[in-house]
Amino acid sequence: MDAFTGSGLKRKFDDVDVGSSVSNSDDEISSSDSADSCDSLNPPTTASFTPTSILKRQKQLRRKNVRFDQVTVYYFARRQGFTSVPSQGGSSLGMAQRHNSVRSYTLCEFAQEQEVNHREILREHLKEEKLHAKKMKLTKNGTVESVEADGLTLDDVSDEDIDVENVEVDDYFFLQPLPTKRRRALLRASGVHRIDAEEKQELRAIRLSREECGCDCRLYCDPEACACSQAGIKCQVDRMSFPCGCSRDGCGNMAGRIEFNPIRVRTHYLHTIMKLELESKRQVSRPAAPDEEPSPTASCSLTGAQGSETQDFQEFIAENETAVMHLQSAEELERLKAEEDSSGSSASLDSSIESLGVCILEEPLAVPEELCPGLTAPILIQAQLPPGSSVLCFTENSDHPTASTVNSPSYLNSGPLVYYQVEQRPVLGVKGEPGTEEGSASFPKEKDLNVFSLPVTSLVACSSTDPAALCKSEVGKTPTLEALLPEDCNPEEPENEDFHPSWSPSSLPFRTDNEEGCGMVKTSQQNEDRPPEDSSLELPLAV
């Protein structure tokens, strides 16, 4: 090792010429360090001295060894390499430190020599294939043991069975991997008597480490258990769960996470191609020289060229956007689908509430609870309302606005409305309750509506002028449906006819009691048979 280091240092020192600028600069530095050196207190006596900078060394003129009329080939003896990793086994091949022979060829001689060597290698390869075919024929594809097949060698294959002259040499690849036995034979033929056996174990460990890439995490990465985090490298995700299986939100690697983004790669590619094509078009349509006067036709052509460049730029942008739209990764699509599914419930709630003419308030209205007791016949709203909120159901016909009061909010001044305050009460008509019968042919049974114990609201019919006036006369007794009717409604109509109050929203279903005491759900729309709704999609709430 010392001899190798010494030879390397000697070569570096030999490269430096004696009369180079490096030696001159050293002499100048040594002379400047002497007692005769000048400083700010002792000005120089001679102004002809101009020291050269050590940073500006002159380039040494070296003889160029590259020649294009001949080929020089250096031949090395084989040694155990310790630098390559074969696909199987050990005994890697290498070269000696110094070459043992040198030979020069012309271009034609080198081409002929290469063809001869390739044909010789091809002849040996065809012999091996012919020998393998004979062994398989004697053993019947390896199913029968044959002593004759075990004794066959390459010398048993004649050259007459192989036609190498009519084979195109350029159609073959000659840098083929060699098996372990062949590598060991080549090393022994080159004079290597002792082959290191420890290299086999090292090569095996390297191959196993190359087969394992990424961490074994699934969706979540624990920094203490993640192999990438322990190694101090980032998690790499080329596609879904490969090579690392962590997700974007669940990766806890302290070094970070890299995800292959095909959209970014495609965008970069399109932008690069666009810039190159625009640059080539600018070079083709260069402006006239400065000494020449620009003619009107030239200016028109230049304007047309700029317009065509702008049009081409817009076309490239459109193609880029189209390509980006079709390059969504699988993980991105799944994430968007999950977001749509999570937001689907809230969207369906908003649409159902809007169809009922309902407004959800964050804070309850200032109405005393004792003035508005609960009703015996609740109204069913098939929507999932958040607990603790207030609901306003505005009237469909508000042709007679009333004067606004001082203490009432602004949204109470537009006309009569129905106010629902969400409270915690047991639901009337729980699933499986006895005594419930089928109300209408167009609606499912009440027990099939899947009504569960959820927050219940109390019905309050209020007016914009006096929200509590309607409830004052009914304190101490249960209000009825006739008490909540406006004055313009006739209460003396027959009970068997459908009742449609003007203050109820058109699509708001309400419940009345028939003569048999069974609850029946009806709607305010006339002459319209509503199909039964799927109870699994919308959960009805009793309010």
From Swiss-Prot:
InterPro entries: CSRNP_N, Cys/Ser-rich_nuc_prot. Residues 42-51, 296-305 have a biased composition (Polar residues). Residues 1-51, 281-305, 488-543 are annotated as: Disordered. GO terms for molecular function: DNA-binding transcription activator activity, RNA polymerase II-specific; DNA-binding transcription factor activity; DNA-binding transcription factor activity, RNA polymerase II-specific; phosphatase binding; sequence-specific DNA binding. The modification N-acetylmethionine is found at residue 1. Residues 31-40 have a biased composition (Low complexity). One of its GO terms (cellular component) is nucleus. It comes from the Eukaryota. It is found in: Nucleus. GO terms for biological process: apoptotic process; positive regulation of transcription by RNA polymerase II; regulation of transcription by RNA polymerase II. Its main location: nucleus. Keywords: Acetylation, Activator, Apoptosis, DNA-binding, Nucleus, Transcription, Transcription regulation. PANTHER family: CYSTEINE_SERINE-RICH NUCLEAR PROTEIN 2, TGF-BETA INDUCED APOPTOSIS PROTEIN. Binds to the consensus sequence 5'-AGAGTG-3' and has transcriptional activator activity. May play a role in apoptosis. Belongs to the AXUD1 family. This is Cysteine/serine-rich nuclear protein 2. The gene is CSRNP2.
